[in-house]
């Protein structure tokens, strides 16, 4: 029986850059009559492929498996992540083996099959299945990975709880919808089929929520960029790799949240080259947010060819505050609701409140009422909660 434990141990004694080569060499020597396919492609999501019933897979005890245990909070509980594992696979009448291991932030898979054709066909089947989703979300945070939790969150995102002007909502929705439905118009007039939208304004007013709702509306793949750094690679190479992945996903959305803190001076030149360079970005809609427009380099904020549309997401105005408060309190039992006069007073007193502060105001009122349970007291509770939330400098 092959000693997989020794193979793994000896390979991991090498320099990190040599580990894939060493493992591939040892496995090839071990199975001279078979083919070894090596991949680091994040689309090779073998575990999910098997869970969906696309193949049968079971763990072999030839290798002492190393499984990391993670606590994901009360809601998700305990999760397990295989670090080193050897599996046997039955797929389309073929029997294969797969050695999965991890080196730093990268997953390494070695597929062992009877022929190169079978290994490649299996690899392509897994990758095609993984990427065959219009709503797939890919995150780059030093490596590319799927984010099923964010995919689920997008499906439940709506505009109902956003405290935004209706006209602003409509304009944002129109920009995204019209981009993905107007490819022929762009081509007819010789325009590059790419756009950039920048949302800016103080925190707590729904930029992130609006982004999720726009992604849900578009129903397109999304690449969420959470880092432009890789300790083993240059900024230029990392950014080129991100844009290369985005172009493979097109038509798609590329999201840079809090772009002012994401992009440093060392990143700027490479990022601008990818946005403006020779490689075409057809089918890519770039979405970015910032809390501090003044901190964003003017090369990004003031060049229409990079972010064509800028939308200010500021503190809600009186009509939006009144509409939000009325809508939320209507969901309460009758005895918990404030009067029309109470809503009107609260609308005036919450000038300068962010959307998040209004959300907190409603929650605070509910908690206070449940504690005291005095019918008809919500007008008074509203005033008290507003004072408690009011920024000190505004009092």
Where are these regions (language model features)?
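Generic structural signal for secondary-structure transition and capping sites
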Residues: 131, 181-184, 251, 280, ...
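Hydrophobic side chains in well-ordered alpha-helices
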Residues: 118-126, 210, 324, 361
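Secondary-structure boundary motif
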Residues: 29, 128, 248, 277-280, ...
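Walker A/P-loop NTP-binding motif of AAA+ ATPase domains
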Residues: 159-341
């Amino acid at each position: 029986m092959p000693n997989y434990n020794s193979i793994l141990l000896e390979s991991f004694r090498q320099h990190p850059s040599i580990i894939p080569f060493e493992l591939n060499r040892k496995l090839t020597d071990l199975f001279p009559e078979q083919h070894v396919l090596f991949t680091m492609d994040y689309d090779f999501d073998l575990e999910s492929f098997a869970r969906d019933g696309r193949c049968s897979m079971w763990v072999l005890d030839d290798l002492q498996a190393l499984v990391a245990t993670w606590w994901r909070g009360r809601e998700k509980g305990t999760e397990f992540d295989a670090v080193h594992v050897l599996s046997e696979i039955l797929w389309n009448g073929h029997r294969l083996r797969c050695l999965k291991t991890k080196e730093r932030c990268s997953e390494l898979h070695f597929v062992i099959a009877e022929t190169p054709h079978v290994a490649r066909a299996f690899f392509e089947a897994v990758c095609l299945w993984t990427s065959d989703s219009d709503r797939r979300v890919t995150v780059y945070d030093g490596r590319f990975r799927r984010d099923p939790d964010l995919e689920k969150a997008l499906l439940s995102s709506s505009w109902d709880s956003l405290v935004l002007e209706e006209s602003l909502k409509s304009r944002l929705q129109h920009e995204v919808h019209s981009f993905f439905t107007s490819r022929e118009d762009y081509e007819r007039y010789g325009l590059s089929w790419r756009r950039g939208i920048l949302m800016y304004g103080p925190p707590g007013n729904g930029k992130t929520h609006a982004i999720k709702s726009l992604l849900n509306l578009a129903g397109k793949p999304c690449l969420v960029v959470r880092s432009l750094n890789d300790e083993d690679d240059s900024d230029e190479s990392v950014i080129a790799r991100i844009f290369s992945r985005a172009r493979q996903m097109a038509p798609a959305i590329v999201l840079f949240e809090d772009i002012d803190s994401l992009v440093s001076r060392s990143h700027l030149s490479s990022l601008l080259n990818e946005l403006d360079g020779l490689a075409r970005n057809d089918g890519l809609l770039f979405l970015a947010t910032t809390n501090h427009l003044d901190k964003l380099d003017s090369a990004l904020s003031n060049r229409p060819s990079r972010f064509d549309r800028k939308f200010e997401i500021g503190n809600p105005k009186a009509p939006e505050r009144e509409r939000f408060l009325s809508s939320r309190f209507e969901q309460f039992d009758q005895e918990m609701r404030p009067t029309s006069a109470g809503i009107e007073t609260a609308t005036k007193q919450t000038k300068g409140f962010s959307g998040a502060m209004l959300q907190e105001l409603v929650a605070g009122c509910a908690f206070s009422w449940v504690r005291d349970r005095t019918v008809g007291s919500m007008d008074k509770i509203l005033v008290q909660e507003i004072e408690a939330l009011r920024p000190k400098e505004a009092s």
